[in-house]
From Swiss-Prot:
This is Nucleoside diphosphate kinase. Belongs to the NDK family. GO terms for cellular component: cytoplasm. It comes from Aliivibrio salmonicida (strain LFI1238). It catalyses: a 2'-deoxyribonucleoside 5'-diphosphate + ATP = a 2'-deoxyribonucleoside 5'-triphosphate + ADP; a ribonucleoside 5'-diphosphate + ATP = a ribonucleoside 5'-triphosphate + ADP. The keyword Cytoplasm applies. Its EC number is 2.7.4.6. Homotetramer.
Length: 144
């Protein structure tokens, strides 16, 4: 059993609609654990840095504007195959294509306002976690 970590964001549209608890319940119901979390209002510079890989793409400015439009919840999730499992729980980026019962199918407003983010690889997870958390802010929880 390989325990891994992934990074997750509850985006401004979901925070504004008071969906944090509902999203956390769904995460925990699947056996994944929240091992670090904080609410932030991203600055333009933080959002640009986090999404630097998309700089120059036509949607970049709108993405930065959206991610700075209100508070977000950033969290580290831990569990077996958590990167793959959380991406399955999120569903496809476009909520119209997301599997029924996924977070995006249930909560996203549109492709732009798609409620959640999750790392797509172990490398991305490590980079994204380190962008917002230092190691001693992460509190592993014993398995039941």
């Amino acid at each position: 059993m390989t325990i891994e970590r992934t990074f997750s964001i509850v985006k401004p549209d979901a925070v504004k609609r008071n969906l944090i608890g509902a999203i956390y319940r769904r995460i925990e119901k699947t056996g994944m654990q929240v091992v670090a979390a904080k609410m932030l209002s991203l600055t333009k510079e933080q959002a640009q840095g986090f999404y630097a890989e998309h700089e120059g793409k036509e949607f970049f400015d709108a993405l930065v504007e959206y991610m700075t439009s209100g508070p977000v919840m950033v969290q580290v999730l831990e569990g077996e195959s958590v990167i793959t499992r959380y991406r399955e729980l999120m569903g496809k980026t476009n909520p119209d294509e997301a599997a029924c019962g996924s977070l995006r199918s249930d909560y996203a407003i549109s492709m732009r306002y798609n409620s959640v983010h999750g790392s797509d690889s172990p490398e991305s997870a490590a980079r994204e976690i380190a962008y917002f958390f230092v190691e001693d802010e992460i509190c592993p929880r014993p398995a039941e």
